[in-house]
C-alpha cells in the first residue's frame, strides 16, 4: 500500500489542512479534531479501499485504517505543513465540545500515546504469573526479578508518563508536568510516606502547613489534576514574564507553586476521589456481577464503534492503582473474542473473495485485541454477525462475572488475557471461568455467524467443486514453478499502480499488470483450469498448471453492468489451453455506459513467487508474452 497517497487522500477528505486543528492516532484510527466536521467528505473517505470506516464521536473525526495506522500517520505528518498538527493540544479559540465529548477527547489524547506499551507490559506480567503458577520460574530468581521490573516499571512510574502526556494535552510544557509527576514518586517522598506509617512518626510541614504524604506510585487521577493546574498557571505566567527569562522562570514558578499545592491539597483530594470511584464501582459490581458481565459483554463493542471505550480506561487504571486489580477489564475479553469468532464464521462461510480477504486479516487482528477491522470491515456491514458477536460476548462475560474473574495487570482484551487473570495464589475457578466464558463467546458467535450471518448469495461458491477442478487443484498443490503468462488481450500495457481502482493499484489483491484493451476478446494466458467465473461474467479466475492463481477483471466497476455486454465461452471446471477464447465483451458499449475498460491481470498468490516481472510494454498483441513468474 502506498501510505503517502492514502495520507494525501485522507488529508483532502477531512477538508484539507485549513480544516485540521490536530491529529493523533490510536491502535487503528487517525483521530482528527476539525474546525468544522461538515467540511469533511465522509462518503468519499468511506469509499476509499484503504479506509475501513469513518466515525464521528467524542468531538473527534475518526478515520479507521487498521493495523497500519502508525505508517499512515507518519506519512500524513510528512506531507507539507502537516507536522504542526501532531500536537494534540487545540488552540483555545476553537469551538468548545460538549462536556462528555471533551472528557473522551482528553482521556484518549492522554492515554493513546503509550497504551500499546502499557498492554505489552501487562502481557509480560501475565506470562510471569503463569510461569510462577506452573513452577517454570521462581519469584526469587534473577530472571524473574529483572523481567518483573520491566513489566512493572511503567505502572509504578505512571505519574511521570501521565505528567508528560497530560501536559501536552492541556497545552503546557510537558517536561514541567513530567517533573511534577516525578516528584510524586521520588524515593524521598515514598520514604516519607513509609515513615509516616510508624506509630511514633513525626509530622513534616511545608511553611508551617502539615504535609499528608501518600504513596502516589501507580496513581492516575492526582497527576492529571496537578498537570491541569500547572498548565493553567503557565499561560498567564508566559504573558506576564519577559521573553528573555520566560524559558526558565515559567517552569520554575510552575514547579514551585504546583508541587506544594499537589502535596497539600490536590493530591489528597484526588486520592480521596480515586478511592470513592473505586469503592463506587466495587459496590455496583457487587450488586449483581452476572448482570454486570452480561451488560458489559454485550455493549462494549458498541462503545468501541463510537469511540466511547476510552471513558472506561481511567476507571480500570484507577482500580489497579487503588485496589490492586480490576474486575471490569476481564469482562471485555469475551466481547472482543466474540467479534473474532463472528469474523471467523464469516471467513469460513462467505465465497466473496474480497470479503474473505478482509475477514482473514481482520480475524488475526481481533484475536490479539484489535477489533476495529473486524467490526467495521466484516461484522457490522453484515449486521447479524455483529449482533451474534455481542450476544456471545454477553454470555461469556456473564460467566466470568458470576465467577468474579479478576485481572491483575492491564492489557488489551485478547488471547493473552488468560495469563493476566491468574491470581497470586495460583490458578483457581475464576481462571477456568475466563477460559469457559471466552470459548463460549467465540464458539457461539462463530457458529451463528457461519449459519445465519452471511447472505445466501455469498454462500454459493463462485467455482463449483467439480471433479475437474478438484483434480486440477490437487495436481497444482505445492507445485508452483516458473511460468510465463501470455497476454489475454490486445491493447496497451499499464503498470498495476496506474489502475484507477485502488484495490488493485495498492497490490492488496496481488502483484500483476494491466491492459487497456483494443479488442473485445479475452484469451487464456496459461494452460490450466477455470477456477471461478463471476455470475456477472466480468471477471474470471484461472488455476494454471504451474500453480499460479490468475484473476482477470475486465474493466473497473463493471460488476454493475450485471452481465450486460459480456459473453462467456467457458464454464467453471473447464480445462483450457493457453490461447483458448474465454469470453467476449462489447468494449465500445461498456465505455459508452461510462466504464473504464482497463483490465487488471493479477496473480493472487504472488507471495509464492520471488518475482512477478513484466516482459511487455507499450502495445501488446493477444497471446504475446506478458509476464514472467519467477520462483
UniProtKB/Swiss-Prot annotation:
A GO term for molecular function: protein-phosphocysteine-trehalose phosphotransferase system transporter activity
Which controlled-vocabulary keywords does the entry list?
A: Cell inner membrane, Cell membrane, Kinase, Membrane, Phosphotransferase system, Sugar transport, Transferase, Transmembrane, Transmembrane helix, Transport
Pfam families from the UniProt entry: PTS_EIIA_1, PTS_EIIB, PTS_EIIC
Q: InterPro entries of this UniProt entry?
A: Dup_hybrid_motif, Glu_permease_IIB, PTrfase_EIIB_Cys, PTS_EIIA_1_perm, PTS_EIIC, PTS_EIIC_1, PTS_IIABC_b_glu, PTS_IIB_1
Record domain PTS EIIA type-1: where: 501-605
- Kindly list the cysteine pairs connected by disulfide bridges: none
Q: Could you tell me which residue ranges the PTS EIIB type-1 domain spans?
A: 1-86
Source organism's superkingdom? Bacteria
GO BP terms in the entry: phosphoenolpyruvate-dependent sugar phosphotransferase system; trehalose transport
Q: Which PROSITE patterns match?
A: PTS_EIIA_TYPE_1, PTS_EIIA_TYPE_1_HIS, PTS_EIIB_TYPE_1, PTS_EIIB_TYPE_1_CYS, PTS_EIIC_TYPE_1
| Entry's transmembrane regions | 120-140, 146-166, 175-195, 206-226, 248-268, 295-315, 328-348, 358-378, 385-405, 434-454
> How does the protein associate with the membrane?
Multi-pass membrane protein
EC annotation from Swiss-Prot or TrEMBL: 2.7.1.-
The residues annotated as the active site are: 26, 553
**Localization annotation:** Cell inner membrane
Q: Where is the PTS EIIC type-1 domain?
A: 105-466
Cellular-component GO terms for this entry: plasma membrane
Tell me the PANTHER family matching this sequence.
PHOSPHOTRANSFERASE SYSTEM TRANSPORT PROTEIN, PTS SYSTEM ARBUTIN-, CELLOBIOSE-, AND SALICIN-SPECIFIC EIIBC COMPONENT-RELATED
* Biological function: The phosphoenolpyruvate-dependent sugar phosphotransferase system (sugar PTS), a major carbohydrate active -transport system, catalyzes the phosphorylation of incoming sugar substrates concomitantly with their translocation across the cell membrane. This system is involved in beta-glucoside transport.
Q: What is known of its domains?
A: The EIIB domain is phosphorylated by phospho-EIIA on a cysteinyl or histidyl residue, depending on the transported sugar. Then, it transfers the phosphoryl group to the sugar substrate concomitantly with the sugar uptake processed by the EIIC domain.
Protein's name according to its UniProt entry? PTS system beta-glucoside-specific EIIBCA component
- What is the scientific name of the source organism? Dickeya chrysanthemi
Amino acid at each position: 500500500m502506498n501510505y503517502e497517497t492514502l495520507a494525501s487522500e485522507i488529508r483532502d477528505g477531512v477538508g484539507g489542512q485549513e480544516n485540521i486543528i490536530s491529529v493523533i492516532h490510536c491502535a487503528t484510527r487517525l483521530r482528527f479534531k476539525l474546525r468544522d466536521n461538515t467540511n469533511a467528505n465522509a462518503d468519499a473517505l468511506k469509499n476509499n479501499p484503504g479506509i475501513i470506516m469513518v466515525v464521528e464521536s467524542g468531538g473527534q473525526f475518526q478515520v479507521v485504517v487498521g493495523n497500519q495506522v502508525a505508517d499512515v500517520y507518519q506519512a500524513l505528518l510528512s506531507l507539507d505543513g502537516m507536522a504542526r498538527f501532531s500536537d494534540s493540544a487545540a488552540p483555545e479559540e476553537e469551538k468548545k465540545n460538549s462536556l462528555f465529548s471533551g472528557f473522551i477527547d482528553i482521556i484518549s489524547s492522554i492515554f493513546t500515546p503509550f497504551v500499546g506499551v502499557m498492554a505489552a507490559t501487562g502481557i509480560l506480567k501475565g506470562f510471569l504469573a503463569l510461569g510462577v503458577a506452573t513452577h517454570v520460574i521462581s519469584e526469587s530468581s534473577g530472571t524473574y526479578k529483572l523481567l518483573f521490573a520491566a513489566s512493572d516499571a511503567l505502572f509504578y512510574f505512571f505519574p511521570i508518563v501521565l505528567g508528560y502526556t497530560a501536559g501536552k494535552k492541556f497545552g503546557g510544557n510537558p517536561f514541567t508536568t513530567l517533573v511534577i509527576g516525578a516528584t510524586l514518586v521520588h524515593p524521598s517522598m515514598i520514604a516519607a510516606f513509609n515513615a509516616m506509617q510508624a506509630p511514633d512518626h513525626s509530622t513534616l510541614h511545608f511553611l508551617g502547613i502539615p504535609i499528608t504524604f501518600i504513596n502516589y506510585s501507580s496513581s492516575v487521577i492526582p497527576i492529571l489534576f496537578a498537570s491541569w493546574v500547572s498548565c493553567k498557571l503557565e499561560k498567564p505566567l508566559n504573558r506576564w514574564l519577559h521573553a528573555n527569562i520566560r524559558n526558565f522562570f515559567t517552569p520554575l514558578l510552575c514547579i514551585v507553586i504546583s508541587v506544594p499545592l499537589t502535596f497539600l491539597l490536590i493530591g489528597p483530594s484526588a486520592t480521596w476521589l480515586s478511592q470513592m470511584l473505586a469503592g463506587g464501582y466495587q459496590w455496583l459490581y457487587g450488586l449483581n456481577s452476572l448482570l454486570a458481565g452480561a451488560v458489559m459483554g454485550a455493549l462494549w463493542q458498541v462503545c468501541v464503534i463510537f469511540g466511547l471505550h476510552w471513558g472506561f480506561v481511567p476507571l480500570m487504571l484507577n482500580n489497579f492503582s487503588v485496589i490492586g486489580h480490576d474486575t471490569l477489564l476481564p469482562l471485555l475479553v469475551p466481547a472482543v473474542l466474540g467479534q473474532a469468532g463472528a469474523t471467523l464464521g464469516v471467513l469460513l462461510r462467505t465465497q466473496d473473495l474480497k470479503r474473505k480477504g478482509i475477514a482473514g486479516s481482520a480475524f488475526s487482528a481481533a484475536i490479539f485485541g484489535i477489533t476495529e477491522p473486524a467490526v467495521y470491515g466484516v461484522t457490522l456491514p453484515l449486521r447479524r454477525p455483529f449482533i451474534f458477536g455481542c450476544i456471545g460476548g454477553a454470555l461469556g462475560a456473564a460467566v466470568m462475572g458470576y465467577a468474579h474473574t479478576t485481572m491483575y495487570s492491564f492489557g488489551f482484551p485478547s488471547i493473552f488475557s488468560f495469563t493476566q487473570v491468574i491470581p497470586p495464589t495460583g490458578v483457581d475457578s475464576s481462571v477456568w471461568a475466563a477460559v469457559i466464558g471466552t470459548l463460549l463467546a467465540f464458539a457461539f458467535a462463530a457458529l451463528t455467524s457461519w449459519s445465519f450471518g452471511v447472505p445466501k448469495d455469498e454462500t454459493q461458491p463462485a467455482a463449483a467443486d467439480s471433479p475437474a477442478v478438484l483434480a486440477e487443484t490437487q495436481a497444482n498443490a505445492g507445485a508452483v514453478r516458473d511460468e510465463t503468462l501470455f497476454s489475454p488481450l490486445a491493447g496497451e500495457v499499464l503498470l498495476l499502480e496506474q489502475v484507477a481502482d485502488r484495490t488493485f493499484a495498492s497490490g492488496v489483491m496481488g502483484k500483476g499488470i494491466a491492459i487497456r484493451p483494443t479488442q473485445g476478446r479475452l484469451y487464456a494466458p496459461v494452460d490450466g483450469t477455470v477456477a471461478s467465473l463471476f455470475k456477472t461474467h466480468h471477471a474470471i479466475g484461472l488455476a494454471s498448471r504451474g500453480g499460479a492463481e490468475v484473476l482477470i477483471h475486465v474493466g473497473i466497476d463493471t460488476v454493475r453492468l450485471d452481465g450486460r455486454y459480456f459473453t462467456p465461452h467457458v464454464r467453471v471446471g473447464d480445462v483450457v489451453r493457453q490461447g483458448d477464447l474465454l469470453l467476449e465483451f462489447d468494449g465500445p458499449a461498456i465505455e459508452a455506459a461510462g466504464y473504464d475498460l482497463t483490465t487488471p491481470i493479477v496473480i493472487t498468490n504472488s507471495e509464492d513467487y520471488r518475482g512477478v516481472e513484466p516482459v511487455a510494454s507499450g502495445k501488446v498483441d493477444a497471446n504475446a508474452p506478458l509476464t514472467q513468474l519467477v520462483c
